[in-house]
Swiss-Prot record:
The keyword DNA-binding applies. Residues 4-61 form the HTH lysR-type domain. This is Multiple virulence factor regulator MvfR. Belongs to the LysR transcriptional regulatory family. GO terms for molecular function: DNA binding; DNA-binding transcription factor activity. It comes from the Bacteria. Both 3,4-dihydroxy-2-heptylquinoline (PQS) and its precursor 4-hydroxy-2-heptylquinoline (HHQ) function as ligands and promote MvfR DNA-binding activity leading to transcriptional activation. Pfam families: HTH_1, LysR_substrate. It is found in: Cell inner membrane; Secreted. The gene is mvfR. It comes from Pseudomonas aeruginosa (strain ATCC 15692 / DSM 22644 / CIP 104116 / JCM 14847 / LMG 12228 / 1C / PRS 101 / PAO1). Transcription regulator that plays a critical role in virulence by positively regulating the expression of multiple quorum sensing (QS)-regulated virulence factors, genes involved in protein secretion, translation, response to oxidative stress and the phnAB operon. At the stationary phase, negatively autoregulates its function through cleavage and translocation to the extracellular space. Residues 21-40 bind DNA. Keywords: Cell inner membrane, Cell membrane, DNA-binding, Membrane, Secreted, Transcription, Transcription regulation, Virulence. SUPFAM superfamilies: Periplasmic binding protein-like II, Winged helix' DNA-binding domain.
Length: 332
């Protein structure tokens, strides 16, 4: 009675745990038909009836209850054998990791050190957020992990998860007309020239598509901020690029009224599906999430050293929203 596909065992156990095929399909992100067929095929392999169907509900048979502990052990052995095989073959494997330039350098150092605990070689590749996803889709890129602020729901060969958040700011030269405008949201900036990251492919995801119709594209954040400091337009940049300039007064924050403390930006991890079953990779994900949380707390503690107060920010603006901020922030 050979079991032809261990994925069928995993799906069957999920059906029993959730109580229905529909629930298991949602959890596993599979179609109802795929999960139902997996259970049926497993019954054929084992020559026993495993479930009783009662409408939408599914209950295990007595034979299934006796087999379930062995099935769980089988999956545990599969994981163990996979880990052993991975370690035997690890050798000089070169894990290629792409990190876009919106990710803080201190986080990149953490990524490298954590991965080197389990992989002999790690190559870190830095690229613009506007090009990150296009890069991992190239067949010759051979990227294993990509950490980026850009988002795409489905990419062949890759799974996606969220590691945490980083901060970004909308900035302009202190003498830019926007510094005296009433800004209710980022949409208020649409009529002014934006300095934005350009994609080599000429296409942008919805997340990174420019807000303004008047756009000047550049290749990197350094070029963006040089033009912003020259008064050419406004831009959106990661916190670690702009905080020194904010302290020096060469840039002003435009997003403080509607996003105090910076704009929360999700950090996504796209990883080759082959890594999903490796415990070392799961440990890396947890370490990466923890490091992002630590960086966020550290920024919060350091923020008062440079961040303007609500009163100071509001006094640089005009209009009803600025007046409301002044009234709320005024001392008793």
């Amino acid at each position: 009675m050979p079991i032809h596909n261990l994925n069928h065992v995993n799906m069957f156990l999920q059906v029993i745990a959730s109580g229905s095929i529909s629930s298991a399909a949602r959890i596993l992100r599979k179609s109802h038909t795929a999960v139902s067929s997996a259970v049926s095929n497993l019954e054929i392999d084992l020559c026993v009836e495993l479930v009783r169907r009662d409408g939408y509900k599914v209950e295990p048979t007595e034979q299934a209850l006796r087999l379930i502990p062995y099935m769980r052990s089988l999956l545990n052995y599969q994981q163990l054998i996979g880990d052993i095989a991975f370690n035997l073959n690890k050798g000089p494997r070169n894990l290629r990791v792409l990190l876009d330039t919106a990710i803080p350098p201190s986080f990149c150092d953490t990524v490298s050190s954590v991965l080197l605990d389990d992989f002999n070689m790690v190559s870190l590749i830095r690229t613009s957020p506007a090009d990150s996803l296009a890069t991992i889709k190239q067949d010759n890129a051979e990227i294993d992990i990509a950490i980026t602020i850009d988002e795409e729901l489905k990419i062949s060969r890759f799974n996606q998860c969220v590691l945490g958040y980083t901060k970004a700011f909308v900035v302009a030269h202190p003498q830019h007309p926007l510094c005296n405008a009433s800004l209710h949201s980022i949409a208020s900036l649409a009529n002014y020239r934006q300095i934005s990251l350009g994609s080599r492919s000429g296409q942008h995801s919805n997340l990174l598509r420019p807000v303004s119709d008047k756009v000047l594209f550049v290749e990197n954040f350094d070029d963006m901020l040089r033009l912003v400091e020259a008064g050419v337009g406004w831009g959106i940049a990661p916190h670690y690029f702009v905080e020194e300039r904010l302290r020096n007064g060469t840039l002003a924050v435009l997003s403080e009224l509607y996003e105090p403390g910076g704009i929360d930006t999700k950090v996504y991890c796209y990883y080759n599906t082959a890594l999903e079953s490796e415990r070392s990779f799961l440990r890396f994900l947890e370490s990466a999430r923890q490091r992002l949380r630590e960086l966020g707390r550290q920024r919060f503690d350091d923020a008062p050293a440079w961040q303007p107060s609500i009163v100071e920010t509001a006094q640089r603006r005009s209009g009803p929203k600025a007046l409301a901020y002044r009234q709320r922030a005024a001392p008793e």
